[in-house]
Amino acid sequence: MKQNIAKVLTFSLLATSAVFISCVDNEKNLFDAEQLRQIYEETFPVKNIDPDGDWTMSRSVTAHVTVNGDLGEDYPIRIFDANPLSPESNAKLLAEGVANRSTSFNVVMDCATALDRVFVARVDRKGHYLVQPIAIENEEVKACFGNKEGSTTCSITRTITDIPAMAAPYTDEYISNKKGYATIIKSGWDLGSGFDQYSAYNLPVFKEKERWFKIQEGGFRARFTTGGTWGGANAVKVIVPEGSTWVIENENQFSDITEVIVENGGKIEITRNASLILTRASYITVMPGGSIIGEGDISITNSSAGFSNYNAGMIDCSRLNIDGGGSGVDFMNYGTLKLNSYNASTSGTTLINHGVIEAGSINGNNNTNVKNGCYMNVAGMFQFGTLIMGHTSEAICGELGYNGNNNDIVMEAQSILTCTGKASLYRHVVGPTTGTALLRIHTIANISGLIESNSKVTNNIICEITDQTSSNEKEQSLWTPFDWLVYKGLQNSATYCNPGKADFLLPADEDGCIKEGYGSDDTPDDVEIRKAVYSYAFEDNYPKAGDYDFNDIVLNVTLPVAGNEVKELKYVVDLQAVGAMKQLGAGLRILGINKSNVETVDFGAGAAQRDGSLSASRIFEDASYETTGSELVIPLFGDAHSVYGYTGTQRPMLNTGNASTSLTDIYTLEVIIKLKNAVSIPSVTNCLDFFIAYQGTGEKRTEIHLNQFNSATANGQLADNNVLEVIKVVNNTWALCVPDKFAYPTERTVITEAYAKFADWAHDQSTNTDWYNMPSSSDKVIEY
């Protein structure tokens, strides 16, 4: 007779695709082991099931979060499964707690197996979120906000930077002394000429190796030059003294050995289309109070031979061009440098700023550098090989360009770099190891190759990004530049935030280096807190084969957020679907909580329906929690149809599509557990045993559990031991826990038809772990 039952069961499933809508009682020795194994293998929709798979789609992850913030400040920590700041985000809160400078936040939380990173947020007293995307590695997450000197809690790439300084090359007294005997320049002179007693070069200065000249008082418009060292000079110094204005109306070129010195009160005026050209070992020095102005250009060609150009006064002209060969040019600015454009192509050239630079554009190739120790404002393109932002410095640009490899940025503490337009992050941006830097960008430029590159933003940098456009795709080829930053670019302790929300303060000082400054606004971030919802989908025919649409009972459970030292647990259970036509109940067994630690178990919404279903059922004890045994077992309902108002033999299928009855209002049960002693939130993966049950012929109910709990019972009964052994060998399942709201199959739709990737996952449960996000067709699933 048992063989005939087996044949009928197999035939009905494989040949006629009839649906099993009720269970027979759990019988001992229902089939012999080989026949039972054959039935299981033939009827389950997946063959060659992963023998090591446990059918779980979540796992426990340990998070360690350290905060080195303000002394005495407690910072809320919130861990999300997605970007919580995105307007389109459906990020769910996985864990929350508090951290400060002396106490880290350590918690065990549940994460979907498909989740490869989490978003750790540190919230300040204004309600502003600093977010750090952290990869899950070896089931751990380690996040660090800020860093104290000598701290061992954060792993940070150490970078030591320095903005070169330069003392004023001359004192006022020294220049005053030199101009006292300097020779006044005459029109047409070549200052490098040799002595000639029969010409204009018959003055003693033309015999000297180091020659000092000066511009006459008042105005001087004549042209002169330095032709080189052929006349015996090895240094030519030209002073533009106080009260003198040298007007350059065409090209004035000085070769090899000329230093142009503009004294306090002296002035050079370069008219439109005119140029001051310094070649090879020639360079300029502008003393405090001196100036070079006009609509013309300054050109430094073929290097300054190791001499530093120095400005402590005012340079306000059209262009500063540094080109040609040589070993590079250092241009030191301690005053004010105003340019329409700065162009540098000589390899090794460095623009070093300790004053104020305002430019229409800065265009340096990838072998030139900018080192900013004070304030820079570039209206348009800002391009360079390497940029160093010194301590307490500020730079603003319209566009942050890209011009090849090694065009990196190093930011020291209390530095701000702002790009009001597009900024290339196809580079390494390295922040401080002590203190914080702020990188403000409107839009990250979509540079070809960025997403595949090893570019990064690392260490203690806050990235304040205006355009947070995201593809919301995990596939790297579909990422936006902001996706790249979030999923790959931010490393170590680098964070991002919404505009105006950075935990960073640098007040403006009109007389100092910080002109714009920064202080966050007072409006908190608008972050919606959504708790995680896990779906439990059951087949009711255990231990016999089913139809495997996994909709006989579907529960959506809103979970408490993972945390430590809690004395109250709240679970919100939605009965989404009843795809069975027999009486089914459901319960919750919580591992790790002994009944002796329970103060009360109360029920909010749905309590009346629960009570009615239990009083009319023999499946569960009619109590808040069962008295048998030491484990905490909470009956959720004794009859799934009863809570929806169906009585007696009225048992329609509910909410499973096709010919089932649709539900307009989903039954919800709130379960509130109050404990005597605080505990950590129980793990969904390891501790929450949601199960369904039906009444067999004996006294005990038959229970249907998730695979990881299928050898345990919550005061009911399981299959016979020999049946359990066959189930263990075949490794099929009657229950699934999906770490999201599950769009479950419609009635009579086998799960492999609803989800094409389900079979691939079942074959190897280390792959296709997000199969539940990809239904084959919307008409094959029910989604709420």
Predicted regions and their residues:
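Bacterial N-terminal signal peptides that target proteins for export
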Residues: 1-10
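C-terminal motif of bacterial Sec signal peptides marking the signal peptidase cleavage site
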Residues: 19-22
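Acidic/polar, low-complexity intrinsically disordered N-terminal segments immediately downstream
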Residues: 24-203, 492-544
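Short, well-ordered beta-strand segments enriched in hydrophobic/aromatic residues
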Residues: 63, 557, 568-577
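Extended low-complexity, serine/threonine- and proline-enriched intrinsically disordered segments
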Residues: 73-87, 580-624, 686-697
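Extracellular beta-strand-rich, repetitive "passenger/adhesive" scaffolds
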Residues: 163-500
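Beta-strand elements of well-folded, non-transmembrane domains
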Residues: 559-563, 575-581, 592-594
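A eukaryote-biased signal for long
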Residues: 624-784
